[in-house]
Regions:
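Beta-strand-centric surfaces of beta-sandwich/beta-rich domains
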Residues: 1-151
Length: 151
């Protein structure tokens, strides 16, 4: 890895009640690994009685979904390298097959989650594979996600 740290914001994404939605995905280039350094989730819930949102970080075996391309921003603008990964957000058609679930969190929609993985324990993605963050809310919610990725 070239120590190219990228910040990838999704903007606000609407979640429908009781429907899983992929809010962020990253695909590694064919011969390069990616490392997910951290993830931040911020909800706009207003009810204290809403059910926590299930957040799943999973491998995707077949994408096949329709999404918006997310534009990564370099942490250090002096680095000449260009981001090689493919980053997507706000899927309107879900990926067809999800693989192994790497992590699951339950987060109350009046709060958020700021998680930076411990050194050497970051989820790694081998070349040509995809990882995604899928959320399921019992009530309709709005979320903004920021991912920090190392290429």
């Amino acid at each position: 890895m070239a120590d190219l740290i990228l910040n990838i914001p999704t903007g606000e994404v609407s979640l429908s009640a009781a429907t899983a939605k992929t809010v962020f995905s990253m695909t590694a280039p064919a011969n390069q690994r990616l490392k997910l350094k951290g993830v931040e989730l911020f909800f706009k819930g207003v009810s204290a009685t809403d059910t926590p949102v299930k957040c799943e970080l999973s491998l995707v075996t077949t994408d096949g979904g329709t999404a918006t391309t997310a534009t990564p921003a370099k942490n250090d603008n002096d680095m000449a390298e260009t981001a090689q990964g493919v980053y997507k957000t706000n899927y309107s058609l879900e990926p067809s097959i999800y693989g192994a679930n790497l992590r699951t969190w339950e987060v109350h929609p009046q709060t958020g989650l700021v998680l930076y993985f411990p050194l050497h324990d970051e989820p790694r993605l081998k070349g040509g594979t995809e990882m995604a963050l899928r959320l399921t809310a019992a009530q309709a919610q709005t979320v903004a996600v920021n991912a920090v990725v190392e290429e």
